[in-house]
Amino acid sequence: HGFAACDGGDKDRIRLMEAANLGIVTAYNDMLSAHQPYRDYPDKIKTAARELACTAQVAGGVPAMCDGVTQGMPGMELSLFSRDVIAQATAVALSHQMFDAVVCLGICDKIVPGLLIGALHFGHLPMMFLPAGPMPSGLPNSEKARVRQLYAEGKVGRAELLEEMPPYQGGGEMIERVSFERTTWN
């Protein structure tokens, strides 16, 4: 079962143990903007592995939450606990003894330690943590500071302040178009 879903070339390489097989553990989800680059990473990693005559498989996904999204909500109580769940999910993903190395995809002070703790259950495997890079806010800091200062002085209202923090990198039903320059709303 460990390679049944692979395409023909990868399936044969894994079955015959002809090449290294990388396990990918990902924290990608559609909700967290910082994770949006990870959507395409598994396919890119698989392509790069094939170019090196190796294979790569997504071993599993781990839950990912953001304190910024759950602040003031009951879910915030789960933030630190999530690290242990992520560690367990990572260990389960790697437990099939199919992999020669592991690539962990995740960002956050709970997610990365959870990935590390789980991957260390298989400490014999070389592991790599691949960051998605900095999370730009879509507005320059000078513009954010300007709007916040005007709000503090009472010169702009709540609506203008909220415009300073539009969603970015990904969208939802309420968003018409997102770019790093501007977000337009439905």
What are these regions (language model features)?
Residues 12-16, 53-61, 158-162:
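Flexible, glycine/charged-enriched surface loops at secondary-structure junctions
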Residues 28-35, 63, 106-113:
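Gly/Ser/Thr-rich loops at beta-strand to alpha-helix junctions
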